[in-house]
Amino acid sequence: MSIEYVQLQLASPSEIKRWSQRILPTGEVVGEISKADTINYRTFKPERGGLFCERIFGSTSNGECSCGKTKRRKLIVPVNFNRLTLQKRNAELEATQAIIEVCPSCGVEPTNSKVRRYRMGCISLKKPVAHMWYFRNSPNVLAALLNMRSQEIDETIHFQTYTPSKYGTQNYCLHGGVQWYVNHWEPMHPYFAGDIDVSMDKAASWNSKSTFMPSQIKTIENCGGEALQELLTRLDLVFLQRMLSRKLKNTIEKKKLAAKSLRKRHKRRKTAKLLGRTDQKNYGITIKVREYSRRLEFIRSLARKGLRPEWMILSIFPVLPPDLRPMIQMSSGRFATSDLNDLYRRLIYRKIRFEKFLTLFDEEFLPDLLIRHDLCLLQEAADSIIDNGRLDKPAQRPNRKPFKSLTSIIEGKHGRFRQNLLGKRVDYSGRSVIVVGPKLRLHQCGLPREMALELFQPFVIRALLEESGVKNIRAAKNLLQRRSQMVWDILDTVVLGHPVLLNRAPTLHRLGIQAFEPILLSGRAIQLHPLVCPAFNADFDGDQMAVHVPLGLEAQAEARLLMLATHNWLSPATGEPSILPSQDMILGFYYLTTLKPTVSLKRPVEQPMAVRGRNLIQSNSIFNNFESVLHAYETSKVDLHEIIWLRWSSYIQTTNSEPLQITVNKTGHVTTVYDSFVMQSGATNGPDNSMLSVQMKSRDTSSISKVYNCLTSLNAAAFYILTTPGRVLFNNLIYENLFL
């Protein structure tokens, strides 16, 4: 079954009854919760008529009643499907359905315990209560429908003002701090339930200050949520929709005319005073347009979905199924219960208390203060179930933490929709804090061994069954729990070459989840190369990342070929590189490749590198390979920034191709000094092997050219480049990371 969408909307009282009430095979109607009890403290079984009643919500045992005397029976009729026609087969299949009875002892219908997840109950209220979503939210739906202020709606619901039962009248005088005596109500009613221009100057025994100011307000029966229900019932949605559409159209036309007249006055250069008055009129028209459009929007929504506004006032309060608000016994013997059970109990207790007051007194002598107080408590109990966090004084646990209401269970990041329906926790995944791993390669990540053992547990179990002689899965799991060395060795083999996916929320683009090769490490933090952090928008100040294991071969191939971090250098949005060296890396490169500074108090005179190189030709800072340079640096024979000569057998690129000095010794070996390297060659084939030394002067290359042309017949030459141990070390690092 595919679910396209989930919609929350109003439910009628008959719909709530259909959810909760059902008829037993005996003809008895069950569904209404009459007691606030949950379970029996001796038998630990649900109380009858309580919040976990088995008669209302179904039995807790599969196919058994509460006492165990009655079980669910099935009538099995043998059917020969080959000879019967389709109609006879359907008729006999209907006869094979389960026969369900009701236990004569406990009255519980033996059913499957799964029905306790969807069977609902209800609480019938003597006086209706308002739904909190429709008078405490912004915009206020009840205020918009009744064309009243939000404060008036709130005061009416919580019995701070009076709404008369006579249609078309409104009270203009009652407010907090005034009490109306019962014997004075009849003579006062024409004044406070009639028109506003009725004279109040008549002398009467009740028209005095001492009568109006003694104590609190006096209300009549039709007040609170019942008063709003009466007003909402009288709303004609079709007429209101037609009337508001006409008013909205006329108001918009007035606004256009006002704007047109304003432009004319600007042309005539009227005074600023007249323009200010016009702006005030336009502002008032804008407010009216906003009010009309908002009210019209609510009315159209109700009419389009076939809903009635009086359904916002609840006279039958629905109760969730018991398995969605469970009560669980812990190992210590105590019970842990959902917060909703405590909130439902408060509502039932206050409902029972109010009904008891109605039975103790006659209607003529009801103590109004107590009745009004109980109705306020009943409204607050209903509000705390719907949205406890929005109350001024929310219902709290003994540890002074507020209860979680229905709204808090549904809304927010950890609510039912975002946490469990839209985004679910998946298998083969984990989460931990990320730390920097500078020794890792770009396509690698450090994975804790404990996390890897849990993530790759099925692969490890399969390897144990195939290679280690373990006979069954239970024995393999016992080996995993003991954490033997064989398990860690198999884990290393399983993880080798198996990519994992790292994801950091929020995943705003496709680079928010990339593939890496795991490297098993001790500890509990995930190590990540610092260069891949910009793609995740991550840093190492406590960020967490999720690990996912691709299971199938197709998923592993996709992770390795498409999602590997080294295959995602460029941003798909801008085309710019997402992997760039950080500032500390650039400073490290500079430190490795720079020359040794001259230590002097005076301003140093910078010598050309070639001059310093010529002075070093006769020194001992000459090396034949990289290993000898690194060994000399590790043994502190040379400094990191010291200038050395290194034998070089590869391609040389230089900006100046003319030699600076050519030296030929008596044996015929030629030493040619260039700007940044030295070339040594074998003996010449000429008759004279005398020493020849020519040094280039400024802008004079004739003598050099003569000698240089004589060197064309040299044997194989050896090149020595001018460098530093730091540059050799930097070259080795690049070579290891690029070509290995």
UniProtKB/Swiss-Prot annotation:
Cofactor remark from the record: Binds 1 Mg(2+) ion per subunit. Binds 1 Zn(2+) ion per subunit.
Intracellular or extracellular location(s): Plastid, Chloroplast
Cofactors (names): Mg(2+); Zn(2+)
Catalytic activity of the protein: RNA(n) + a ribonucleoside 5'-triphosphate = RNA(n+1) + diphosphate
Keyword Ribosomal protein in record: no
SMART domains: RPOLA_N
Amino acids binding Zn(2+): C65, C67, C103, C106
GO MF entry, a single one: DNA binding
GO cellular component: chloroplast; DNA-directed RNA polymerase complex; mitochondrion
Xref: SUPFAM superfamilies: beta and beta-prime subunits of DNA dependent RNA-polymerase (SSF64484)
GO biological process: DNA-templated transcription
Binding site for Mg(2+): D539, D541, D543
Pfam family membership, one: RNA_pol_Rpb1_1
Domain of life: Eukaryota
EC numbers on record: 2.7.7.6
Alphabetical UniProt keywords: Chloroplast, DNA-directed RNA polymerase, Magnesium, Metal-binding, Nucleotidyltransferase, Plastid, Transcription, Transferase, Zinc
Similarity annotation: Belongs to the RNA polymerase beta' chain family. RpoC1 subfamily.
Job of this protein: DNA-dependent RNA polymerase catalyzes the transcription of DNA into RNA using the four ribonucleoside triphosphates as substrates.
Binding partners and assembly: In plastids the minimal PEP RNA polymerase catalytic core is composed of four subunits: alpha, beta, beta', and beta''. When a (nuclear-encoded) sigma factor is associated with the core the holoenzyme is formed, which can initiate transcription.
Descriptive protein name: DNA-directed RNA polymerase subunit beta'
